[in-house]
Amino acid sequence: EYRRQRQMCIRDSYGTTHADYMYGEIPCARVLTQEEIDAGYEKNTGTVIIETFEGKDPMAVPAVLCKNHGPFAWGKDAKEAVHNAVVLEEVAKMALFTEQLKPDVEPAPQRIQDKHYYRKHGANAYYGNKVE
């Protein structure tokens, strides 16, 4: 089960595009139970997303993959949410191709991930274009 889920989630940042927009792994929410499907599928999909982000900053990783459903992305407004959805799609493709080319690839060093994320999103952010 872990291996199947592993293939659906983007657990590692292999490069700076991922690190520029999302700090850490892009999580994969669990499958809804039959009871959750029967008693409010849409509401419970949202509940499972919230559950997935317990103890995490949802704005540091503004996306989630819902197993057997698909991606969700958000932002401070609709334009940023769409931008984050596009980034998610590109990062997913890059991770897939990277793992196909080199299955034992190592993630980018944490210091590189930190530099790329915090220079755009940290308290002293100085780099990158703001989504307007």
What is the predicted function of each stretch?
Residues 4, 29, 65-67:
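Short, conserved beta-strand edge motifs with alternating hydrophobic and charged residues
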Residues 9, 21, 27, 65, ...:
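Conserved beta-strand segments that form the floor/walls of ligand-binding pockets within enzyme
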Residues 11, 16-17:
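Composition-driven recognition of glycine/serine/threonine/acidic- and proline-rich low-complexity segments
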Residues 17-53:
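A structural-propensity feature for long, helix-poor, extended segments
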Residues 1-10:
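Single conserved hydrophobic/aromatic residue that forms the stacking wall/gate
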Residues 5, 45, 80-84:
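Residues within well-formed alpha-helices
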Residues 38, 51, 55-132:
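A conserved C-terminal secondary-structure "cap"
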